[in-house]
């Protein structure tokens, strides 16, 4: 890792402000706000371990505050174990230790806990879920169930354990990837229990406590949980119209020993960004140059409304620098719980041994059904895409009609609409929405840096009548929330 003796940027006001990102907008005394902003910058990796923070007087001048404010902020960070104050040497960001592992344990699985909570609430109280991007089943799931039962009966004399996956399913996945431009053999495919297990396996196999991982910001919440669970230090990179910001990734790779980059190049969750071929080439080259592993999540790749997504990043990589993961749950049925990992055989063998420790192999009946579905994929997927295209247009129209201040870009594929609030907090709105019978995912839950609390991720996977009723409930919640905001502003005005 580079820059172990480097100060936090050149010490200029604009550079520090960029790293602290609007620190003064918080609540409480100035030194509390500054400490919170510095803590967040350290946790998201904008300020790396071993970095010397600016001298108190210089930072005070750059931020237009008193020196005592910076002194108090640094003291607070030292008390939390985030920095060390060295006599005559300044204030330094501490290496990863017990604090980071504790923080990982505290924050891990928050999205899963939230999902379990809202699912339970949904069942008990009849709330409409606009929370999870889990589609209902295609008709072929029911149609092929009898044929799957016959196949299961045929193989029932076998013990049923295939740690790497049911061979016919591995063959079908390999064919599908090859057709998408990534030449793949059956021996390079590992079947997993959904893409979530695939992500968790890469985290367990390749990342240890204190090691650096780059995640998109925003990104799939389950990926944040999986990599936090390892005790990794997460460095966030913003997502634009063409995917993860590769200029920033290049800078991060130059100054930190990054173990792994997680990216969703095809209809990114939640922004629906699509990475073009040139950027895929570039990311593969960056990973190869720096000896960093790319884990690309292709769960939404086949859900293009118009032009097909480019080939996976692994198609442009040499050697073992890219691992590709995917899911059949997003295409055929959320309850199918079948995912996969594609990697060079030596890497796959390592992942397969690790998966065997977890479960000895995924459910055979689901795999048998998945293989039959893939055999008819060219017939089934266009039907699913037309359904999603229609529901995406409907959801966009509903949001524009009932929530006219909310903004969004029309997705070209995938499963979700990434909406921006005109003001306020999506986390606070989520509580009001729940009271009004609608469950939503605040944007902050998609962010490893806890940003995007002014966004809401809205899936368009539900039936049209459910989408319409859900948005109407959300609109009532938004009106109620805006009324609360107005009352708070008036109370603050009176106090002032």
Report residues per predicted region.
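Conserved glycine-rich beta-strand-loop-beta hairpin in the small C-terminal domain of fold type I
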Residues: 371, 388-396, 406-420
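Conserved PLP-binding active-site segment of the aspartate aminotransferase-like
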Residues: 65, 343, 418-423, 440-479
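N-terminal basic, amphipathic alpha-helical segments
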Residues: 1-150, 352, 356-362, 372, ...
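Conserved core of the PLP fold type I
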Residues: 156-290, 302-319, 467, 482-496
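Active-site PLP attachment segment
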Residues: 88, 315-350, 362-365, 454
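Glycine-centered flexible beta-alpha turn that most often forms the glycine-rich phosphate-binding loop
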Residues: 297
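Short beta-strand "wing" residues that participate in macromolecule-binding interfaces
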Residues: 84-85, 184, 440
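Structural signature of PLP-dependent enzymes
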Residues: 157, 351-358, 374-396
């Amino acid at each position: 890792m580079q820059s172990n003796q480097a100060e936090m940027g050149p010490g200029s006001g604009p550079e520090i402000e960029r790293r602290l990102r609007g620190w003064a907008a918080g609540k409480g005394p100035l030194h509390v706000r500054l400490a919170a902003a510095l803590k967040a910058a350290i946790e998201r990796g904008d300020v790396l371990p071993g970095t010397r923070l600016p001298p108190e007087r210089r930072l005070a001048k750059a931020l237009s505050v008193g020196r005592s404010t910076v002194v108090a902020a640094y003291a607070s960070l030292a008390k939390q174990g985030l920095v060390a104050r060295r006599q005559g040497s300044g204030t330094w960001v501490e290496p990863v230790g017990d604090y980071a592992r504790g923080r990982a344990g505290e924050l891990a699985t928050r999205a899963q806990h939230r999902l379990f909570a809202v699912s339970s609430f949904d069942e008990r109280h009849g709330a409409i879920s606009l929370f999870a991007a889990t589609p209902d089943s295609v008709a072929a799931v029911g149609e092929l169930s009898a044929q799957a039962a016959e196949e299961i009966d045929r193989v029932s004399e076998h013990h049923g354990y295939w740690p790497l996956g049911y061979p016919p399913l591995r063959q079908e996945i390999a064919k599908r990837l090859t057709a998408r431009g990534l030449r793949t053999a059956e021996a390079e495919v590992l079947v997993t229990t959904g893409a979530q297990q695939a992500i968790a396996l890469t985290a367990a196999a390749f990342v240890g406590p204190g090691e650096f991982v780059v995640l998109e910001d925003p990104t799939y919440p389950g990926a944040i949980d999986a990599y936090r669970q390892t005790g990794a230090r997460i460095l966030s990179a913003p997502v634009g119209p063409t995917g993860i910001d590769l200029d920033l990734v290049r800078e991060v790779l130059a100054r930190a020993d990054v173990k792994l980059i997680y990216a969703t190049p095809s209809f990114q969750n939640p922004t629906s960004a699509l990475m073009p071929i040139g950027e895929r080439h570039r990311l593969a080259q960056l990973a190869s140059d720096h000896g960093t592993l790319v884990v690309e999540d292709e769960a939404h790749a086949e859900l293009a409304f118009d032009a097909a997504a480019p080939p996976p990043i692994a198609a442009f990589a040499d050697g073992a620098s890219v691992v590709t993961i995917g899911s059949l749950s997003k295409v055929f049925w959320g309850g199918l719980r079948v995912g996969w990992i594609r990697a060079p055989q030596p890497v796959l063998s390592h992942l397969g041994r690790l998966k065997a420790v977890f479960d000895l192999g995924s459910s055979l009946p689901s795999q048998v059904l998945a293989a039959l579905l893939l055999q008819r994929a060219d017939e089934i997927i266009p039907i699913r895409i037309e359904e999603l295209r229609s529901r995406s247009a409907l959801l966009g129209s509903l949001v524009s009609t009932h929530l006219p201040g909310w903004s969004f870009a029309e997705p070209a594929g995938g499963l979700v609409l990434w909406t921006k609030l005109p003001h306020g907090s999506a986390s606070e709105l989520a509580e009001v929405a729940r009271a009004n019978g609608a469950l939503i995912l605040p944007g902050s839950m998609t962010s490893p840096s806890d940003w995007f609390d002014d966004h809401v991720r809205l899936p368009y996977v539900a039936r049209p009548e459910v989408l319409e009723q859900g948005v109407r409930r959300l609109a009532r919640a938004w009106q109620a929330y805006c009324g609360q905001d107005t009352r708070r502003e008036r109370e603050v005005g009176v106090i002032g």
